[in-house]
Amino acid sequence: MESQRNILLIGLLFVSFLLWQQWQADKAPKPVATESSLVANAANSHSADVPEADTGVPAAVTATSKLITVKTDQLDVQINPIGGDIVFAALVSHKMEQDKDQPFVLLEQTKDFTYIAQSGLIGRDGIDSSAKGRAAFSTAATEYTLAEGQDTLEVPLTYVADNGVTYTKVFVFHRGKFNVDVDYKINNTSAAPLQVQMYGQIKQTIKPSESSMVMPTYRGGAFSTQDVRYEKYKFDDMAKSNLNQATLGGWAAMLQHYFVSAWIPPATDSNTIFSSVSAGGLANIGFRGAVYDIAPGATQEISSQFYVGPKDQKALSAISDTLNLVVDYGFLWWLAVPIHWLLMFYQSFVGNWGLAIILITLTVRGLLFPLTKAQYTSMAKMRNLQPKLTDLKERFGDDRQKMGQAMMELYKKEKVNPMGGCLPIILQMPIFIALYWVLLESFELRHAPFMLWIHDLSVQDPYYILPLLMGVSMFVMQKMQPIAPTMDPMQVKMMQWMPVIFTVFFLWFPAGLVLYWLVGNIVAITQQKIIYAGLAKKGLK
């Protein structure tokens, strides 16, 4: 009876978890979409000197202003010489779709959608501002390619102002990496001092996340400061209030499932993390750096980094000790982090993510085996106590206080913990939820094949075979536990439908998660047989 109730408890906890996370996603108001409110918000922006970006294709990109193309082993990038903005970025080593050769496009600027990385110099003598417009850079070539044996590729852009000051903007690309160094070199050949300030921002058309109850994903902003290690800043947050936080270091990013773009200014600089929403419906998040005073005849260098790529925790940690937090495991991150590490460890040996999931399932079940054994032992003792519990109910009738006291004395005498059957279930749920987030957030599982018909563990089984097998395994587990005569008829009906309900839920779950649950059930059935054989020798049934 207790086992049946425990399975029911798992179902209720699991459904409650899904409903809770869907409520979390839906409870906040949607982004303000009216033109008047967006204009008002833009007018109140703390980043008023930062230039706006037009929606659609920039008018400046004409036959006389050709985009600069940069190709490396990881990135295919296009830079607009007007301002030096990155207006296109494709990830060469990541496909848009598994069965096609088209690379995944993260940044782009089309008629209907804008997602670009903008940077420039603002301030009193800045060459990029709302009032002055953008600088028109010149470059020696319009196509750059990282050659074989070449570790870095520099793309220099030059602008000479009316006062004779030379501004050089250099993009530095690295082999095997998704981060780009953006360096300014200002040679003040004028007779007057200059004052400039670097900024970097990411601009994106407000677009809803492609999220569902079983596959919740986030699309929006995020930032980090010296006081706030990591915080999401949703599009509706930007529409309601402009972010304006002073910090040492920090970073600002746009997130989506598996991928991130981020500006990371120097960790020792005084920066301001800001956000805004422009009148055209573009959400902006970025940083404004320190103000530099450049004396006549002096040269000043100002640098920052831009990352555009997958949520690779190792690569992100190498750039900033908090940037890896964009891989958000939720409130059980402390449990998910070691699970992810163990998953990576197993995969490095077996070379297959599906086998790694099976190994981590065996590990989890092995660690929980002592608790599982204690659970079934407690349940067996409870079953043996049923005749005595029935006698207590008949003896005390409706006197619940005396009956409860007598039951506790009986449990103490027989050394039975009535909650012993629930504890392993309660401990397994956080592990399951943590693994759920690991499989959902880990970009390594994107397009990762297992075997046979499972070509991508990050999406649902295309033929629903794993969910059906999982349902069968639950049915077998259920049949191995006899239904006690004292069990409530309503609970019996709910228990009979639980394998069906779980099967329906798991139809749309990532195949990797269903694989974990299926293997876990098979292991549980095996453990159950072993434990029951041992209990039978002790006279417990």
Curated annotation (Swiss-Prot):
It is a multi-pass membrane protein. CDD domains: 5TM_YidC_Alb3 (cd20070), EcYidC-like_peri (cd19961). The chain crosses the membrane at residues 6-26, 325-345, 349-369, 420-440, 457-477, 500-520. One of its GO terms (molecular function) is membrane insertase activity. The keyword Membrane applies. InterPro entries: Membr_insert_YidC, Membr_insert_YidC_N, YidC/ALB3/OXA1/COX18, YidC/Oxa/ALB_C, YidC_ALB_C, YidC_periplasmic_sf. It is found in: Cell inner membrane. Its main location: membrane. Keywords: Cell inner membrane, Cell membrane, Chaperone, Membrane, Protein transport, Transmembrane, Transmembrane helix, Transport. Gene3D superfamilies: 2.70.98.90. GO terms for biological process: protein insertion into membrane; protein transport. GO terms for cellular component: plasma membrane. PANTHER family: CYTOCHROME C OXIDASE ASSEMBLY PROTEIN COX18, MITOCHONDRIAL, OXA1. Required for the insertion and/or proper folding and/or complex formation of integral membrane proteins into the membrane. Involved in integration of membrane proteins that insert both dependently and independently of the Sec translocase complex, as well as at least some lipoproteins. Aids folding of multispanning membrane proteins. Interacts with the Sec translocase complex via SecD. Specifically interacts with transmembrane segments of nascent integral membrane proteins during membrane integration. Belongs to the OXA1/ALB3/YidC family. Type 1 subfamily. This is Membrane protein insertase YidC. It comes from Shewanella baltica (strain OS195). The gene is yidC.
